[in-house]
Amino acid sequence: MPSMDIVSEVNEEELRNAVENSRRELSSRFDFRGKEAEIEHKEFIVTLKAEDDFQCRQLVDILRIQLSKRDVDPSSMEVDDKAIHSGKTFSLKVSFKQGIDSLVAKKLVKQIKDSKLKVQAAIQGDTVRVTGKKRDDLQAVMRLAKESELGQPFQFNNFRD
């Protein structure tokens, strides 16, 4: 019986590469010349620091562009609403979602069951395991998960026949 896992993960190497590319672009951008701005990366949290709140938002856009160039889905980013002002710099934390939250997993399982496909979906920790009789049904579930607007990107692994 074919089965697969639906997960939501960010590749840490690609994230690091996107941050490095953002730093390079930051050093060459004309609007950041002579300004204090930096991008720090620690595991799945990126801290953006700049002299102005507007510049912090520009750093978010730079990071988002570099992520999409490195095939990391920017919808996995969670950007703080307000920049923290300390001294003469503003800092903004960007965290990346790892794993599927239980509420999102429940919504995904409900969508799969409402689609009337002949598959079974079960929540296993931060993944969703889908099993079915036909491979085509699993591919339809893949399409359904990618098209769903749940605010989180999904990847598929452990595809077994």
Curated annotation (Swiss-Prot):
Domain of life the protein comes from: Bacteria
Keyword hit for Hydrolase: no
SUPFAM superfamilies found in the cross-reference section: YajQ-like
Molecular function terms, GO-annotated: nucleotide binding
InterPro entries found in the cross-reference section: DUF520, UPF0234-like_C, UPF0234_N, YajQ-like_sf
Coiled-coil segments: none
Keywords: Nucleotide-binding
Any matching Pfam family: DUF520
One GO CC term on file: cytosol
Role description: Nucleotide-binding protein.
Family of this protein: Belongs to the YajQ family.
UniProt protein name: Nucleotide-binding protein Sden_0770
